[in-house]
């Protein structure tokens, strides 16, 4: 009961925060990255697996979808394979995962430590920013075509927290 109330409350807060941010910044589409078996195949340690798999992600995604659509914001769930491995700044090609395929892909950058991704040019970028940008790029190929300077992605110091 306590757990359900906590996640219902947190889901509502997250959904409201995203909806409010989109309205204030004139954003018309929200793209959420999703993998079908991400909980079943997670291998991040025994305790971390228990904590991660405990979160009702689909319920939270549903709340975000409902809030967005209630104010006319388009909600899209996008398959997100390889978005954390591909380099956004180097414009790596992002393949789609195929079950049973043994194809090896080479990406120009790599994750160097928790939360940091290093590009081919040696630029350090937040790993979540890299992955999220690639999810958007995977859904909308030309999402960033008019932007020439991406330095704001790795020079930003503003932190957003949900309370």
Name each model feature, range by range.
Residues 1-163:
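Positively charged, helix-rich recognition surfaces that bind polyanionic ligands
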């Amino acid at each position: 009961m306590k757990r359900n109330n906590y996640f219902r409350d947190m889901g509502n807060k997250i959904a409201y925060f995203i909806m409010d941010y989109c309205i204030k910044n004139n954003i018309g589409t929200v793209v959420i990255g999703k993998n079908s078996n991400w909980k079943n195949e997670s291998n991040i340690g025994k305790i971390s697996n228990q904590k991660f798999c405990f979160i009702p992600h689909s319920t939270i995604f549903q709340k975000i979808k409902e809030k967005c659509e209630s104010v006319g914001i388009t909600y899209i769930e996008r398959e997100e394979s390889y978005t954390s491995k591909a380099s956004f700044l180097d414009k790596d090609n992002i393949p789609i995962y195929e079950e049973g395929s043994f194809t090896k892909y080479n990406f120009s950058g790599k994750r160097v430590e928790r939360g940091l991704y290093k590009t081919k040019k040696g630029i350090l970028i937040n790993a979540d920013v890299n992955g999220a940008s690639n999810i958007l790029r995977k859904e909308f190929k030309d999402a960033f075509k008019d932007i020439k300077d991406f330095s704001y992605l790795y020079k930003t110091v503003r932190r957003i927290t949900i309370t």
